[in-house]
Amino acid sequence: MSGWRDIGRRVVDFAVTFILYYIFGVALHEMGHALVGQALGWQASVTYPSPWAGWTSFPQWQQMPMLDMVLIALAGGLIVCAFFLILSAFTEDWESDMVLLFFAPLHGFYSLFEVAYILHAIPQWVLATIPILPAAIIWMWMLKTRG
């Protein structure tokens, strides 16, 4: 019976860890956009309508040079990707490592797709769905190489 208890505990640990890192990732992602925008001299505001979603607004978005737009778009996801990869190197529990290694590439790919979106190269539905596919492939590869 203790085997089932251990499995149940790990499932609950994984679910709680997933939710917490998801919320933290959303917050850090949007703050990354805002901080890079402010560093480039633009006014920014971050809105979190729920723990599951957020967006960063720039009142002067239409007046920005394309390079600034691209840097701001890249910043959110790449900051989370780098932070989660570094954090996973120091994580000893299985649940945190699994979640961090899933969200790191997801945010990395999402940042690339955000650039494509602001360049009008992809529609919003692609931005909202497709980055999970390459992220899942990389996640499985990282899990396999970690043993």
Which role fits each region the language model picked out?
Residues 55-147:
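Metalloprotease/metallohydrolase-associated module, dominated by Zn2+-dependent proteases
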Residues 1-6:
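Membrane-interfacial, low-structure loops and terminal tails that flank and connect transmembrane helices
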Residues 10, 26-30, 73, 108-111:
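Hydrophobic transmembrane-helix microenvironments that flank and shape a buried ionizable site
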